[in-house]
Each structure stands twice: as C-alpha cells, then as structure tokens.
UniProtKB/Swiss-Prot annotation:
Family, as annotated: Belongs to the short-chain dehydrogenases/reductases (SDR) family.
One MF annotation (Gene Ontology) recorded for this entry: oxidoreductase activity
Residues making up the signal peptide according to the UniProt record: 1-20
EC number of this enzyme: 1.1.1.-
UniProt protein name: Chanoclavine-I dehydrogenase ifgE
Species per Swiss-Prot/TrEMBL record: Penicillium roqueforti (strain FM164)
C-alpha cells in the first residue's frame, strides 16, 4: 500500500471524478491534509462529508480555484504552505473536455479559435501555472521526497483527426511534465504524468455530445477498442506516484487503461 501518511497534498479539480477519487484515497491512506482547488463549489460539501467518514483525522480544505489565473494559483499554493507549513505532493487534475463527432471533414476547418484557446488555457496553461507554483513552494521547504503528478490523456497518443485542441493540450502537457521532471529532480521534487484511458467520470459524456446516455458513450468507445476504466483506477496510480513508495520514479508517463485501441 502506497504510504502518504502524515503528509500534505494539493489537488486541483479535486471535487469530482478522478480528482475526488484521488482526494478520498489520500484520506483513506492517512494523509494529514488534502487541499482541494476546483472551479465549482457544487460538490464541496459532499466531498468533505465522504472524506470525513473515510478518515476523520484527515483535514480537508476546499477552495474555489481558477487554474487559468496564475495569481489565484500562486495565492492558493502559498495559503496551503502558510496553514500547514508543508506541501509534500500535488496532483494537477483540473481539465475540460472537447466534444468529438461534431465537425465535418476536414475537421481542422471547423476547429474554432475560441474553443482552441479555451481548452489550451485550462489543460495546458493551467498545468504550467500550477506546476510552477508548486515547485516554487516545494523548493523553499526543507529537503524531503516531494512529488507532483500532472494528468494527461491517451488522446495525446491516439492521433484522432478531431478534437485537436484537447489532444494537443494533453500532448503538450505530457511533454512539459517530462522536461520539468529533469529540471526539478536534483532539488528532491519528482514530477510525473498519468495518462488515463476512457474513464467513467461526469466528464465522459462531454466527449461524445451526440450520445444520449452515459452507457451509449461507453459503447461507442468499446466498439472502437477502448476499455473503460474507473476514476478509482486512475486515482490509485496518482496516489502511488505521490507516495514515497514510487521514489525515485520521475519523468514517467503512466497509461491507465489502453494506451491505444
């Protein structure tokens, strides 16, 4: 079992889906504190209550956070260190989807400027802002095993002739993560990526907008050769990378589920 006991973590996009599963698993494994930043406060109360039942000793702090704002991100990370005096690990999970099957071929001609900018702003710029703030905070703390995990996607590998912004954002995020890993490892900060396959989360239907039900979405992917994994499957990999058990792994990109159909 990956050890995260008595450690402090920051999770973006932590109020639902993979983020919530990661937050709950950290509590289950004995984390001292889990600090969640999310663009929506809708699930905060439910998350806090569920984590309290899992482990009353884990402190849970939920904050509204827009990862596209470097000012907000820096302030949020600083507030965690100010409150707990430490930051052992961070998982940058916040992201948005892009719907497939909505464009006529050649699909590149229908990839809009606004959508392109929006997706890259959250999925790439957000990862950059968060990683930078976390490295800044961790470097100023006493030497310890510290870990950052950025969540990518198999979309970065599958070369789909559609949803260009999403695939590009995830591919660039994974490349960025590998480069940062080489930069920060000498300072005791490990940085890695996790690239989930098709994952059963509230975000899943947004990838196939024409589907009428979640089951229909899953069936579309199954017919294309993809397995469907659960948020908890991805969370276990993230928590392992956040834990001391994964040391000295850095610069890795771990696929969860099929990397390619």
């Amino acid at each position: 079992m990956a050890s995260v006991k008595s450690r402090v973590f920051a999770i973006t996009g932590g109020a639902s889906g993979i983020g919530a599963a990661t937050s709950r698993l950290l509590a289950e494994r004995g984390a001292t504190a889990v600090c969640v930043g999310d663009i929506s406060c809708k699930n905060f109360d439910e998350l806090k209550e569920s984590m309290k039942k899992i482990n009353p000793a884990t402190e849970v702090h939920c904050s509204l956070l827009d990862v596209t704002s470097p000012t907000e991100v820096e302030k949020w990370v600083k507030s965690i260190v100010a409150k707990f005096g430490n930051l052992h690990g961070a998982a940058n999970i916040a992201g948005i989807a892009q719907g497939a099957g909505l464009r006529n071929s050649p699909t590149i001609l229908e990839e809009g400027d606004e959508e392109w900018s929006k997706v890259l702003k959250v999925n790439l710029d957000g990862v950059f802002y968060c990683t930078r703030a976390e490295v800044r905070a961790m470097k100023s703390l006493p030497s310890d095993d510290r870990s950052i995990v950025n969540v990518g996607s198999i979309a970065a590998l599958s070369h789909i002739p559609d949803v260009y912004a999403y695939g590009t954002s995830k591919g660039a995020s994974t490349y960025f993560t590998t480069c940062v890993a080489a930069d920060t490892f000498p300072f005791g900060i490990r940085v890695n990526s996790v690239s989930p396959g098709i994952t059963d989360t509230p975000l899943l239907p947004q990838f196939i907008p024409k589907a009428k039900t979640s089951d229909e979405v899953k069936e579309v992917y199954r017919k294309e050769g993809f397995s469907v994994v659960k948020a908890g499957d991805v969370a276990r990999t993230i928590v392992w990378l956040l834990s001391e058990d994964s040391s000295p792994v850095y610069g890795a990109n771990i696929n969860v589920g099929a990397s390619m159909p």
